C-alpha cells in the first residue's frame, strides 16, 4: 500500500515540474500559490461538512496541488525566501488539521480523528525540530506528508464509491502507519543525537 502511494507521488511530481515552470514564467508568486492552497483546504473542509464529499475531494486535490507546486515555483523562479518557508510550513500544518479533522463529518470517531491529527502534527514537529538541530529528516519514516494526503484522498474516495466501513478500515491503517512514522522519526533523532 505504502509503495503504491509512493509511486503515485512520483507520477504527480512529473506533472508538477512543467506546471511549476509555466507558473514561474507567468510571474505567479510562490507565496500566492501557498495562500491559494489554504483557501482550497478551507473550502474542502466546509464542503465535507455540508456532505458534498465529491466536491470536497476536488478541492482537496486543488489544495494538495498548490502545496506541491509552491516550493517548486519558488525554486524555479529563484524566489526562495525565509518568509516563503515560514508561510509554507505554517499553512501546511493548518491544512493538515483541516484535511484530517473533516473526517468527523463522515461519522468517524472524533476521538480517533483528534489522535490522527495529533500524530500527523507530531511527525511534522519532529522533522522541524530535528532540522533546527542540523539533522536531515527527509525520507525518514514510512509515511511522509505527501503519502498522508494521498491516504486522505483514497479514504474519501472509498467512502463515496464503496462504503463508510471500508473507508474506516483504511483510516485505521492510516492511523497505524502515522503512529509508526512518529516512532521511526523519534528513534532516528534520538539515535543521531546520542552519537
Swiss-Prot record:
Hydrolase among keywords: no
InterPro entries per UniProt: AIP_synthase, archin_ph_syn, CDP-OH_P_trans, CDP-OH_PTrfase_TM_dom, CDP_ALCOHOL_P_TRANSF_CS
GO MF term (any one): phosphotransferase activity, for other substituted phosphate groups
Transmembrane parts of this sequence: 28-48, 54-74, 97-117, 149-169, 170-190
UniProt topology in membrane: Multi-pass membrane protein
Pfam families according to UniProt: CDP-OH_P_transf
Classification via PROSITE patterns: CDP_ALCOHOL_P_TRANSF (PS00379)
Binding site for Mg(2+) 1: 67, 70, 88
Keywords, alphabetical: Cell membrane, Lipid biosynthesis, Lipid metabolism, Magnesium, Manganese, Membrane, Metal-binding, Phospholipid metabolism, Transferase, Transmembrane, Transmembrane helix
Catalysed reaction equations from the record: CDP-2,3-bis-O-(phytanyl)-sn-glycerol + 1D-myo-inositol 3-phosphate = saturated 1-archaetidyl-1D-myo-inositol 3-phosphate + CMP + H(+)
Residue numbers binding Mg(2+) 2: 67, 88, 92
Catalytic activity, EC: 2.7.8.39
Gene3D superfamilies linked: 1.20.120.1760
Cofactor(s) demanded: Mn(2+); Mg(2+)
Active site: 92 (proton acceptor)
CC cofactor note: Binds 2 Mg(2+) or Mn(2+) ions per subunit.
Subcellular location: Cell membrane
Any single GO BP term: phospholipid biosynthetic process
Claim: Cell membrane is one of the keywords in the record: yes
Pathway as given in its UniProt record: Lipid metabolism; phospholipid metabolism
A GO CC term attached to the entry: plasma membrane
Family: Belongs to the CDP-alcohol phosphatidyltransferase class-I family.
Cross-referenced HAMAP family: AIP_synthase (MF_02242)
Function: Catalyzes the formation of archaetidylinositol phosphate (AIP) from CDP-archaeol (CDP-ArOH or CDP-2,3-bis-(O-phytanyl)-sn-glycerol) and 1L-myo-inositol 1-phosphate (IP or 1D-myo-inositol 3-phosphate). AIP is a precursor of archaetidyl-myo-inositol (AI), an ether-type inositol phospholipid ubiquitously distributed in archaea membranes and essential for glycolipid biosynthesis in archaea.
Protein known as: Archaetidylinositol phosphate synthase
Amino acid at each position: 500500500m505504502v509503495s503504491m502511494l509512493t509511486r503515485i507521488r512520483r507520477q504527480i511530481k512529473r506533472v508538477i515540474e512543467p506546471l511549476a515552470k509555466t507558473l514561474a514564467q507567468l510571474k505567479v508568486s510562490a507565496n500566492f500559490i501557498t495562500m491559494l492552497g489554504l483557501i482550497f483546504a478551507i473550502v474542502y473542509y466546509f464542503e465535507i461538512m455540508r456532505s458534498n464529499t465529491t466536491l470536497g475531494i476536488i478541492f482537496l486535490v486543488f489544495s494538495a496541488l498548490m502545496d506541491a507546486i509552491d516550493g517548486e515555483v519558488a525554486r524555479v523562479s529563484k524566489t526562495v525566501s525565509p518568509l516563503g518557508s515560514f508561510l509554507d510550513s505554517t499553512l501546511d500544518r493548518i491544512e493538515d488539521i483541516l484535511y484530517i479533522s473533516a473526517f468527523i463529518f463522515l461519522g468517524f470517531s472524533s476521538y480517533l480523528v483528534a489522535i490522527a491529527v495529533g500524530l500527523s502534527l507530531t511527525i511534522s514537529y519532529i522533522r522541524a525540530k530535528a532540522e533546527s538541530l542540523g539533522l536531515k529528516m527527509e525520507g525518514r519514516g514510512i509515511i511522509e506528508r505527501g503519502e498522508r494526503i494521498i491516504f486522505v484522498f483514497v479514504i474519501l474516495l472509498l467512502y463515496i464509491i464503496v462504503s463508510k466501513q471500508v473507508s474506516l478500515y483504511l483510516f485505521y491503517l492510516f492511523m497505524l502507519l502515522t503512529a509508526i512514522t512518529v516512532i521511526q522519526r523519534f528513534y532516528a533523532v534520538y539515535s543521531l543525537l546520542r552519537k
